[in-house]
Amino acid sequence: MKVSIVICAYNEEEKLPRCIDSVIAQTFSNWELWVINDGSTDSTAKLVQQYAEQDHRIHLHSQENQGLSSARKAGIECAQGEYLTFIDADDYVGELYLEHLLEPLHQHPEAQCIQGGHLRYENGNITKVAAPETSHFSPSEVITLSYHPRPIWAVLWESSFMKQHLDSIPEHINLAEDIVITLQLYPHLKNVYFSPYADYHYFIHGTNMSYAQRSVLDLLKVSSAVNKCANLDYWKNSDFVFSLQFNFIAKLLKAVSHSSASTSDLVSALRQLPTPHISIQFLKRSIGYGSYFYTWLLKHRCYKLLVYLAKIRFK
C-alpha cells in the first residue's frame, strides 16, 4: 500500500525544508510526496527540485497562483497512492505520523477517512488536540461529538473517494478552506475512523493575517460556502456547523464595519450570501442573542440595517 502526501506551497522556502525532512524521516517508507508549487516567486520550486533529485519519491508540480483550495485539488489529481494525506508547508509531522494513521486499516480496510490529532503551537503555548480512541463512527454520529475534525490535514483519506468527489472541493477560497472542504466531503463518506495519536505539529504564526484584516470578499466567499453547508439536510442538526455559520457571519460583519466601501457596495456584497440556516433549538445552547439577531436580519434581507448596525457594533 502506498500513501500519497500532498504539500501545497506558496513562497515557503524557509519553512518547507523542515516539513519535507519530517516526511523523509517517516518510519513507514512506502510513500510518495507531491509538492504543489502554487506560483511561488521565491526559491520554493528550486528547493523541491533539489530534494527530488536526491529522493525518487519526491515530486514537484508547479502551477500559476490559484489559491490553496485549487492547489489541494491539483495534489489530489497527482496522487497515485491508495491513500493520501495533506501537510501544510509551514507545519511538520512526527516520524510515526503515517504509521499511526494507517493503524486502523489493519482491522478496518474499508476505512475512507481516518482522523488523527495534532499539537497546536501558538504564542509559545502548546495544546494537544487529541482525537477519540481508535474507533469507528458513521459520519452522522461524528458531527455530534465534542471533538469534530475540521482540518483537512492530519487525516488519511481514501484516494479514490477524494478523486470521485473532487468537484465537491470549492476553488478560489483562501480562508478556512480546509473547514469548507471537510463540510463538503463528509456527507459523501460511508465511515470515519479515529487515531488517538497527535503526530501533526500545527503552527499558528504571528504573521498570519487575522480575520479582521481579511477583505470583505474573502470572508464573503467562506461565509457563503459555510451557509450552503449549514442548509444541507446532513448538517441541519449539527451544533458545530450551526455555530460555525454564525462565527463567519460575525467575522464578515466585522470586516464590513472596517471597510471603506460605500453602503450600496456593501449591501451588494451581502446580497450574494446564501440564506443562512437558523433554528431556535440552537439559540440557548450555542449562540448569543445578538449574533442570532444579525443572522435573522440576513435571512430576511435587511441589508442596509445590517450594515448600519455593523458599523456601530464593531467599530
Locate the predicted segments by residue:
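Catalytic core of nucleotide-sugar-dependent glycosyltransferases
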Residues: A198-H205, Y211-S238, A250-P276
